[in-house]
Amino acid sequence: MLFRSGWMHDFLEYMKLDPYFRKHNHNKMTFGITYSTSENFILVLSHDEVVHLKCSMINKMPGEYEDKFANLKAGYTFMLGHPGKKLLFMGQDFGQLHEWDEKTALDWYLADEPLHGDLQNYVRGLLTLYKKYPALYRQDNDWDGFQWINANDADRSIFSFIRRDETKKKNLLFICNFTPIPRDDYRVGVPKRGNFTLLLDNEHGLYEKGDGPAVYKSSKGECDGQPYSFSYPLPAYGTAIFRF
């Protein structure tokens, strides 16, 4: 397996940008898909990127303190959906503030702080979905496992795509908004009529049994080059993963 350092560089360069200028660098997030099946890749955010004054992962993010966490949630969601195995370095799940130092322990107390604890729970939700849905790993090296819905919405810095496994019975739809601008009636194209069950979003995290996850019904109406579509209230830095 091969660490995908080129992807990591492009991903971090994009994530560090002021959201209002990300539209000029949209290709940094889409280029990696063009060669994602050529090797057995690991998408890694390594220790090399959180030392030597490069800043911790949370402090690479732009904006005010709360914005940093929202940005990182969006980034991690995109990373989860991107083909390739995943590797986060220690402390990146709860927003370690200091750079990595091999001589000291992580600042574990931060996990008890609201924003840090919320980020950790969100990452836990992402990993729960990763374990539960083979669509997120079984076809990393097969073009049938990934489909862009809209890779070209640079002006709004929104990405949407589908992950599939061999059965094509438990597909996942991802939507990621990388700006602080909410899209209250965001319409996304989909390939079929039916129910799209919301599994996770950036405001609630993972919807588990008893949470009453929302179900969106697609209807006939072309969008994003697809024959069906539905509308979803996409928040600032909004992320959403649907099962269909």
Indicate residue ranges for each PLM-predicted region.
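Glycoside hydrolase catalytic-domain groove-lining segments
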Residues: 17-48, 75-76
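Short, small-residue-biased leader/transition segments that mark boundaries at the very start
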Residues: 1-2
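Active-site donor-binding segments of glycosyltransferases and PAPS-dependent sulfotransferases
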Residues: 5-13
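Carbohydrate-interacting/catalytic domains
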Residues: 20-24, 48, 53-57, 63-88, ...
